[in-house]
């Protein structure tokens, strides 16, 4: 699990412990990106533990608007290509990417390994309004031999927030 947000790290580690997964889940407190071993700015929208809405290396939010920052700091980012290429990690079977609007950058930084047959499925959170990013993700997935299976709404119950966000599920052809 990659979790660069100081707001979310404690919640993640507690959940791993409470679910008896400490021997199965490794936490890396770095951000994934298309830039190799680079310190960039991490922006957070609040100081609430377990919260959403952060941005790494960009100053826009998940809707493409200027990010309203309540907290920011520099943190190390890296590419999946570098982590897998240097055998820091093993190639996973399943990947979930939910990084508040920079999913396309994470996939760019993983391009060398996406065709690997060991990766069976990838779930990617997408904002359908951000057409350039949306189209880039769909193209990368298709070019990497994945097919679209389903999408699930991220809309909060009783709220219009996250109305255009969906978790897209892709499987290897």
Name each model feature, range by range.
Residues 1-173:
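Phosphate/nucleotide-binding beta-alpha loop and adjacent structural elements of enzyme active sites
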